[in-house]
């Protein structure tokens, strides 16, 4: 058989035409997920394609200092952004990060001989949807907490729900309606007084970047959705990453191996009380490189500007559309009522007009 020998312009035209047959974030809005979707800058693809990053994960530490340095640097970036003591990069997705964080919570309660007692995880109705499944997979009974008339966590109902059986409260702040939990400090106190842990779902971290940190609000564990906040690819089934940050007293339970700096060198080590591995090696390396490059490129001022524009864009859109918005004030997103219109028709219209 004679292989085809098309000219380069023909090949370029062919693949360009194929790309135009698919829908992508370059063609229009990408409204997947309850989070702030955005354009991912293409420079991070160049960074991830560098040959220096293509090393074998079993290479000895002394010959992988650059790679370990990036992993350690990303841990430090994320911990600082979230107000945590440290972080693990191993979980391969946001939901996997939730599962990992809850396994850390179980290990903590087990270390206090309370694992058999603390069998419940409280999840508000306004929480990110995966929280319910993650808690169940971690072996917990899920207690759903209805929202109050303002769309937030009702403090009175929370006080009745917590007790000696409470392992954790999972909270998304701002929540799926874009509402900030204004009673967060009181909520944290209620959970901690009952002996539970406060878990932060980072789905909506875009609204807080550079302006507020979950750790300062009283959260003990959090996961970061790098595909929602730090410009890594979204959707498609992976590969992905869902780093988990924790406060100091929970650090010893994080997955192994961990990356640390000692005497000016980076090394891997296994904490004695680790929950073990949740993914191969240090997670999906090239995804993590993209998140590192994005954070390093923006810096403190850039991250702060990102959150400002996320909130500004949502509020600008709310002023422009003619729909009923029952809750507010909101941050990076809002929920609107379609009224007599069909929500599916609205979505199709957005695609038709490239809104």
Model regions: which residues?
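N-terminal glycine-rich, Lys/His-bearing helix-loop that initiates the first secondary-structure elements
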Residues: 1-52
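Conserved phosphate/anionic-ligand binding catalytic regions in large, soluble enzymes, centered on
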Residues: 23-44, 90-101, 230-245, 282-293
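Terminal amphipathic helices with adjacent charged low-complexity linkers/tails
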Residues: 31-59, 323-355
